[in-house]
């Protein structure tokens, strides 16, 4: 199929969202849908557990939207969720993560 990132960039309303973890480290994550802007607010703090749970909902919806539109799921949303879960595992569920910004 070729470069799937290029495919999504041309056809899917994608967004990057930047987070600051409780230890001060920052990380950017990809969503193949703008759904994250409906569930999160830039500049807001979230307990790690809530951030992970809400991200899971967003990535599931994003995957469904890609599947409905193109007939296949989105590997990028699965990879995003894996990255979020891996990073979040370093912190207590009640620690705060900040969603710093959305980038289109």
Where are these regions (language model features)?
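Motif-centric detector for short Cys/His coordination patterns
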Residues: 2-104
């Amino acid at each position: 199929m070729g470069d799937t990132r290029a495919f999504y960039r041309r056809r899917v309303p994608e967004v990057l969202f930047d987070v600051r973890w409780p230890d001060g480290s920052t990380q950017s994550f990809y969503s193949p849908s703008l759904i994250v802007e409906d569930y999160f607010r830039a500049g807001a703090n979230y307990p790690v557990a809530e951030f992970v749970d809400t991200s899971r909902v967003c990535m599931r919806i994003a995957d469904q939207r890609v599947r409905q539109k193109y007939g296949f799921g989105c590997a990028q949303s699965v990879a995003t969720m894996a990255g979020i879960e891996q990073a979040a595992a370093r912190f207590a569920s009640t620690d705060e993560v900040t969603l710093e910004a959305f980038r289109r």
